[in-house]
Amino acid sequence: NKKIDRTRIAKNPVGMVCKELQADVHLVYVEESYVKKFTDIINKVGLDVDRIYLNPYTSAKGTLDGEAWKLGVIYVDIGYASTSVTIVKKEKVLYARVIPLGETHYITDLMSRFNISESDSAEIIKKLKNKEFEADATIRCGTKKILLKDVKDIISARTEDIVQYIKDTIEISSFNEIFQKGIVLSGGTIEIEGVYEQIANSFNYKVRRIEPIPLKGLSNPSYSDAVV
């Protein structure tokens, strides 16, 4: 928002005369040295970097349709190692926030709770995504079986952390009244049994899941950035 002399809201104040101009600004920044490491790697393989994009932006761009970009949506990408919340409206990114919380944390939770290896834990997550359960409501892990209920309790606890993060981000952003298209979920983690449903039931907004924009050879929502 832009205000002229503390009272008048102006979409485009260029050319107006006033004593004071106010604006709400959200800055997204990254350490220059951090970016340089990536550009150096790209340069070493003989490629040039033409432009650098904010990762949540590219993920949203590769997933959302034009209507969502115009009318306003909260785009949540729950990936393998991080979760990003991107608030867009009128084809602009109004707010973006990322935390290191994703599928890998579900894996480590299962490792800790059931004292199993990382590969066994990852296999359980895969079975949850594919709904590969035993007839007696267990999940086979190597030579032993684990109660499906116990696994889902672990998944639910970690999902609640993500739900709270989304709520906190919406509150901090102050953009909680402009989303005609509600919340859109993407990323490989929402394929885990129960994750999407728990998030959808935690908000008054309309919540839906979405696949990346159709592209031949791309079916996994984990790679939505690649279509941009």
Q: Can you say where each PLM-predicted feature lies in the sequence?
A:
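Short, ordered loop/turn segments at secondary-structure junctions
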Residues: L54-T58, K90, I99, E211-K216
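Glycine-rich phosphate-binding loops at beta-strand->alpha-helix junctions
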Residues: I178-S202
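A conserved active-site cap/scaffold subdomain adjacent to cofactor or substrate pockets
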Residues: P100-F114
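Phosphate/pyrophosphate-binding loops at sites that engage ATP/ADP/AMP, CoA/4′-phosphopantetheine
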Residues: V163, K167-G182
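Glycine-rich phosphate-binding/hydrolytic loop that grips phosphoryl groups
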Residues: R208-V228
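Residue-level signature of catalytic and energy-coupling elements of molecular machines
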Residues: I42, D77, L110, I166, ...
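Nucleotide/phosphate-binding catalytic cleft detector across ATP-hydrolyzing
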Residues: N1-V73, L94, N130-I154, S173-N176, ...
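Gly/Thr-rich phosphate-binding beta-strand-loop-beta motif of the actin/hexokinase/Hsp70
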Residues: L64-Y95, L110
